[in-house]
Amino acid sequence: MKRLSIGSAVLVVSLIAGLAAQAKPSFTGSWKLSSDPGADAFISPTMAVAQDEKLLTVTTTGQFGELKTTYNVDGTEGKSPLDFNGNTIDRTSKLAWDGDKMVLTTTSDFGGQSFEVKQVWSLAADGSLLIEATRPDFQGGGPVTTKSTYKKS
């Protein structure tokens, strides 16, 4: 009887460990905005995502040209400096997981000013990429949150 109980306990622990170690979703691909971004110039109409066991690389193209940001999949901080109009903006990036949602945080420092953009990525049942982004209102108001839907292109 004791062996059965120990065996059952080992089985339960193994199942729980297996569920915890499930693979995270892959966001790799070319994506095109399918929801109306409104007047928010910070939402890119297209983006390319490359994801492997070490890095997530997001390349967006929009009003401000091409922008590439890399994130370390292990959760450590990374650097993604941005050259803009002859100036360098220092950017620190970090990736974290909240269940099957990926949380991307990018902090930018420029001219003594610092601001943070946080994005929560998830995949819908139909394979669409859902992004909820929160950034500062650069007009002096509180944070601005936008929700965007992308389809693979």
Task: Describe the predicted segments one by one.
Residues 1-10:
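Bacterial N-terminal signal peptides that target proteins for export
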Residues 12-21:
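Hydrophobic h-region of N-terminal signal peptides that target proteins for export
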Residues 22-153:
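Hydrophobic small-molecule pocket/channel-lining residues, especially in calycin-type beta-barrels
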